[in-house]
């Protein structure tokens, strides 16, 4: 793989993680700003919102707000990761893939496979993070192969 190809892949990975991060930051803020039933209905968009009751116990609101906080910091982390990936950081390439990827594994297993969400935006964001991870691996290992070839 040429250096130009590696750079292009890293730029694409950056754009994917920044989009993913901004969407999750917005979701985090909206989750915290709303009461639990509205927050849950916002995420579980394939479920009839009428099934969510008007109020939940304050502990349920706190739990949902914790989830919103996690979405917010994870989104911020991946946006920052995108900045450092743009600059060629292999460390941030790895950690951004781990943080964003593990987050979406849970979403995929419990929400997508559970049938609680529509394809857009949730499943699309899982595809975005999966694509970023695959392209990260191609850029990293393709670039490593190029370095090995240059030495020999």
What is the predicted function of each stretch?
Residues 2-152:
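Topology signature of small-to-medium multi-pass alpha-helical membrane proteins
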